[in-house]
Amino acid sequence: MSAPEHAAGLDGVAATRPRVEALTRPHRLRPGARVAVVAPSGPVPEERLRAGLDILRGWDLDPVVAPHVLDTHPTLGHLAGADRARARDLTEAWCDPAVSAVICARGGFGAQRMVDIVDWRAIREAGPKVFVGYSDITALHEAFALRAGYATLHGPMVAAGTFLSDPRTQESLRATLFEPESVRTLGLEMARALAPGRARGVTLGGCVSLFTADLGTPYGRPSARGGLLLLEDVGEEPYRLDRVLTQLLRSGRLDGVAGIGLGSWAECGPYEEVRAVLLDRLGGLGVPVVEEMGFGHSETALTMPLGVSGVLDAERGTLTLDVPALR
């Protein structure tokens, strides 16, 4: 007997909230494509950036580094330069007709500070392009979804340690960029059900603390109704994960969610304690929940498309996309 397929949004409250809809997918990359590297968040180590650029060149891509990528804010050392400079780099890279993709150099903190300075009208007028990042970049994934209607890639960043050291992480991104039909079924071998079931929906999410921080902002997502919510985090102790998940529950953001896929919880304490929080806060929603899918701050970080419809199967530990991540 197959697992039950959950239909989100059937209760009265959740049904009044807007559904998560599939977004416009950008085109896949071709050999020789120009890729802009930007730093919306924290300062970028130059040696690691160079190593990441070499990997991209090895894929026959043409990476160009935005003007302020190696900046450091004069008084706030956790930022890669001034907010307006970082926002301008992203806007100009996106609006450059020669650029096919924009990949972030690293996370940290800072995307929330610049997201409202980005020229979203110009972004919309320029049309969809490939956008890649994770962690702090969750704020921009949400903005591209809600302000531009573009699907994006929750994937490794150019100067991130996992991208530099793990061949499987590299291959997941490379295949998604060039051969997206080959990676329509996602999930590492260790993935398993935290709560049973099978659900169809549209992917969204990212770093749970950043996803939660968007609550109450002018462009914050009203709900995850009909969505397959992908969550992970780093450096958040179990009680802090409890807090952000409880906030998501109390705010109604999880009303009508179709299913939940969980990635890594690096430096969040013993996994048994983290798992207990995840089960307590998410296990009672009546939707499938898959743990250890292999995305985020993990030794192997799969590229996960956001804004694409698919099926989450808890028993198989997989997310299967209805269409390739890129056209």
Residue ranges and their predicted role:
Residues 2-98:
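ATP/NTP phosphate-donor binding region
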Residues 37, 102, 136, 211, ...:
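Buried hydrophobic positions in well-ordered alpha/beta secondary-structure cores of metabolic enzymes
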Residues 43-55, 198, 202-234:
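Conserved beta-alpha junction segments in alpha/beta enzyme cores
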Residues 101-117:
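N-terminal glycine-rich "phosphate-gripper" loop used for MgATP/nucleotide binding
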Residues 118-143, 151-157, 285-289:
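Short, acidic/small-residue loops that bind anionic groups at enzyme active sites
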Residues 149-212, 216:
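Conserved anion/nucleotide-ligand pocket segment
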Residues 219-274:
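Internal helical hairpin/lid segments
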Residues 262-327:
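ATP/nucleoside-binding phosphotransfer catalytic cores, i.e., glycine-rich phosphate-binding loops
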